[in-house]
Amino acid sequence: MASNVEAPEPWYLALLGFAEHFRTSSPPKIRLCVHCLQAVFQFEPPQRIEARTHLQLGSVLYHHTKNIELAKDHLEKAWYIAQQVPQFEDVKFEAASILSEIFCQQNLVDSAKPLLRKAIQISQQTPYWHCRLLFQLAQLHTLEKDLVSACDLLGVGAEYARVVGSEYTRALFTLSKGMLMLMEKKLSEVHPLLTLCGTIVENWQGNPIQKESLRVFFLILQVTHYLDAGQVKSVKPCLKQLQQCIQTISTLHDDEILPNNPADLFHWLPKEHMCVLVYLVTVMHSMQAGYLEKAQKYTDKALMQLEKLKMLDSSPILSTFQVILLEHIIMCRLVTGHKATALQEISQVCQLCQQSPRLFTNHAAQLHTLLGLYCISVNCMDNAEAQFTTALQLTSHQELWTFIVTNLASVYIREGNRHQEFSQFKHSK
């Protein structure tokens, strides 16, 4: 509660204490926690307590139960009531943030966007929430593959962070924008942006872990930029710096970061995730450079690390890392003739994608492509053709499309359908 508000009633503190006790029990007693919070409304509390309780109920129901509709109802009430209460930013914007997550989960993106836009509009005097909501809306546009709108929002965020004196968060916004520009293959525009990022990162003096994490983000983008441009030899110095950064971060204490500027209250990735990501880009470089044994060695290390992390951490990004690593190592196995192992790993990718609709949508074309390559390796040309044809229908990625067409062409040549089938490519893209 804010200091300028009267002390809360004893009944409220008692119910809140019980609710928190049940929530943090092992195992959590969510039903009892919810009952305690619902009991608050029996006392007809003032608006501040009413709004906060609706937020707490919505958050508990969203994170710990499947009753999403009831969670949404409480969060909508929290958002509505909190807008009528002065100086109640945390409740107001947290309600908007979680509510927009639920809308996205329910594919109600057209409800999430205006909610986030309004929250962004009225949060300009609250730097932490303004930046967080900008990141959230940019992420929503990215998931919709509207990278232009996402880049615009990240640009707005970078300028806002500069104005409020947060060079750290300005760097995060700018690096995020650079990442999206790499996704769009805007290589000529990425170079000056990365140069700016490098300057901001090197000049920023602050928490050592935050500084090293910015440096890792920057170097990851540099490596990706060089690999996209086919400049494999230019990657080595960046990889060496990345490995040094990870070693430095691992020696730093993970104390809670409490910066003076509230706009600095962000962190890119946990250091354990960064470690896996460095393994991943090392594997990508090794594959492009033709160092297949090295690629296998780093993939094995990364997958072992991922298995340990996933026992304690349910973050979706870990499954994404795992799928990308497996996609690379499967290519390695097929090139080196380890077909049975490749098939087992393709099965692992299938299982991971089945657990996440978004992962399946993003990797279905790659999965069918890998199956097609496996079919070629065991001389099942009809099956290879079917897999590649399906993959073509699922991808809008130009480089993957070219790779699939090249392999499909090799299938047609082996089958003797060269002239008849090549004509189809003219109309397929």
Predicted feature descriptions by range:
Residues 1-61, 65-67, 147:
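N-terminal alpha-helical scaffolding segments that mark the starts
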Residues 10-14, 35, 52-54, 73, ...:
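Residue register of alpha-helical TPR repeats
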Residues 7-8, 29, 45-48, 66, ...:
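Short coil/turn linker motifs that delimit alpha-helical repeat modules in TPR/alpha-solenoid proteins
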Residues 27, 64-65, 106, 137, ...:
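Structural motif corresponding to the intra-repeat A-B loop/turn of tetratricopeptide repeats
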Residues 37-43, 76-84, 117-124, 155-163, ...:
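Amphipathic alpha-helical segments of tetratricopeptide repeats
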